[in-house]
Structures are given as structure tokens and as C-alpha cells.
Amino acid sequence: MATVNQLVRKPRVRKVIKSNVPALGKSPQKRGVCTRVYTTTPKKPNSALRKVCRVRLTNGFEVTAYIGGEGHNLQEHSVILIRGGRVKDLPGVRYHIVRGSLDCAGVKERKQGRSKYGVKKPKK
């Protein structure tokens, strides 16, 4: 236990928690414009062509975001919404694109887990 004198000389320091998604600031999502849409390969031992895009956010940040789901309609200058959430096998990709909002369409023919891919409930 520190004495009052010791605390006067050197106060207790709070731990600073570093954000995993600095480009979002304190927001849950941010809007941005696609500057480049491309595919990239994951780290070992995985193998695929993962769809990603560079996004210029409204706050000036430029980040790489992952496009989840099968097929997409994004191209350069598409306006999209991004959320936090990294992709473990793609280094530097710390954001996901929100499907079914703004210019990004939902996943076609999706029947299960629809809310994560921006798909409305199908008609009976």
C-alpha cells in the first residue's frame, strides 16, 4: 500500500486500452466510398481468393474492409457502411462491410443467417 506522500509524488496511472478499430472512433459504423475492389490470398495454411476493398471513410481514414458472403455488387465509388471485426487470416483487414445497406446489396438466395447478410425474410 502506497503512502499519501508517495501518491503525491507519483500518482497511480490508469491503463490505456488501445482500440482494435481506430478508424471508427467511438461510432458503431462509418460510411465510406470504395476506392479499390480486389481479391487477396489468406495466410498459411488457408487458401482462397478473399474479396476485399479499400475504403475512404467520411472522417478521412483509408482502410481495408472485407466483403462477406457469396457474390457482391461493389465497384469503385460505391458508397458503403463498415463495421468493426477483423478477418483472422487476412493481415491488415480489421473491418467488415455491412451487407444490405447503402450501395451494397444483400446476398442472393440466402435462407439461413440472413440478418448478417442483409436479406429480407422470404415470402411463403
Curated annotation (Swiss-Prot):
The family database entries (InterPro entries) matched by this protein are listed as: NA-bd_OB-fold (IPR012340), Ribosomal_uS12 (IPR006032), Ribosomal_uS12_bac (IPR005679)
Taxonomically, which superkingdom? Bacteria
UniProt keyword terms in alphabetical order: Methylation, Ribonucleoprotein, Ribosomal protein, RNA-binding, rRNA-binding, tRNA-binding
One Gene Ontology cellular component annotation? small ribosomal subunit
- One Gene Ontology term of the molecular function aspect: rRNA binding
- State the organism named in the record: Buchnera aphidicola subsp. Acyrthosiphon pisum (strain APS)
Protein name as catalogued:
Small ribosomal subunit protein uS12
Functionally, this protein is described as follows:
With S4 and S5 plays an important role in translational accuracy. Interacts with and stabilizes bases of the 16S rRNA that are involved in tRNA selection in the A site and with the mRNA backbone. Located at the interface of the 30S and 50S subunits, it traverses the body of the 30S subunit contacting proteins on the other side and probably holding the rRNA structure together. The combined cluster of proteins S8, S12 and S17 appears to hold together the shoulder and platform of the 30S subunit.
Pfam families the record matches: Ribosom_S12_S23
What phylogenetic lineage does the species belong to? Bacteria, Pseudomonadati, Pseudomonadota, Gammaproteobacteria, Enterobacterales
Query: Which NCBIfam families does the protein's record reference?
Result: rpsL_bact
Gene (UniProt): rpsL
